[in-house]
Amino acid sequence: MEAVEIVATITPDQELLAAAALHDTVEDTDVTEEQIRAEFGDRIASLVAAESEELPVGISETESWRSRKQAAINRLAAASHDAKIVAMGDKLSNMRAIARDYEEIGDELWTRFHAPNGKSDHEWHYRGLAASLAELSNTSAYKEFVYLLEKTFCK
């Protein structure tokens, strides 16, 4: 629900808040985009779909990590303003968790992920996300995101 709280600092739009609440549903459960569309409508389903990443069949998460993240950065760069707001909630929530865990356990953190080059891959990914979300640079959420990015990766 942290993503919803973050999005609420940017907009009161109830559909964006709903999309933020549902942003990982397609990726992490058996619920489909079509089911979300039937229950919540086109706009929310489209916003959730914009945040969903598909794993390629027959390739490990580690082998496909960089290409998946590059595709996500590219999609986000081309996404609508509303989709970027929903993504900001998700990405800042993730960055908060990374920064918090990095403070606690240091470089051991990077072994939890599928990025083949650990911390350097994550830095590349999060800097790409920051560039893709730059139109939100006037928001406190974006400013916190960049602050945490610098704090975490410039150590």
Spans of features found by a protein language model:
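Active-site helical microenvironments for divalent-metal-assisted chemistry
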Residues: 1-155
